[in-house]
Design a protein with these regions (language model features):
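Acidic/histidine-rich, metal-coordinating catalytic segments
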Residues: 18, 36-54, 74, 127-131
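Short small-residue beta-strand/loop micro-motif enriched in glycine and branched aliphatics
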Residues: 9-13, 69-71, 95
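C-terminal domain-tail junction helix/linker
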Residues: 64, 88-144
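An active-site-proximal beta-strand-loop segment
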Residues: 1-11, 22
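Active-site beta-loop-alpha junctions of metal-dependent nucleic acid enzymes
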Residues: 13-37
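RNase H-like polynucleotidyl transferase catalytic core
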Residues: 43-48, 62-81, 97-102
Length: 144
């Protein structure tokens, strides 16, 4: 998962694991997603997981022009916005109802993200949705 620090627009894609190829694929997908919204990723904060500390991930960040920093070990509050987004996703999407299967839950993820980004009020944004913080005609505002 990724969250834009300014707008709080969230992005999530499911991968089978947290190994290097998956985290690099996620990074590339996140960059493309945010670029489509007019957001350029300049800095990235991650935890200290082995995939994020790898040379492969460092090269991917460098190739994309992203400055990569790490949270302080054992201090998740260093990345509080991301941690809050994770908790919101768990509470409102993953565990927000009883799903018949994991596949059904995963199939509803795009609808939840569309709601979260374009319609869900956010207290830190004056009870406006994250898309309201994006400039111009972006896809979230056009499709809401």
């Amino acid at each position: 998962m990724a969250i834009d620090d300014h707008s709080r627009v969230g992005f999530v894609q499911m991968y089978p694991n947290e190994q290097r190829p998956s985290v690099v694929a996620f990074l590339e997908a996140a960059v493309a997603h945010y670029e489509a919204l007019g957001v350029t990723i300049k800095r990235l904060i991650t935890d200290n997981g082995p995939a994020y500390r790898s040379k492969v991930f460092a090269r991917a960040c460098q190739a994309l022009g992203i400055k990569h920093t790490f949270t302080r070990p054992y201090r998740p509050q260093t990345n509080g916005k991301a941690e809050r987004f994770i908790q919101t996703c768990l509470r409102e999407w993953a565990y927000g109802r009883i799903w018949a299967t994991s596949q059904e839950r995963t199939a509803w993820l795009p609808a939840f993200l569309a709601y979260y980004n374009a319609r869900r009020p956010h207290s830190a944004l004056g009870y406006k949705p994250p898309a309201s913080r994006l400039g111009g005609n972006n896809l979230l505002q056009i499709n809401s």
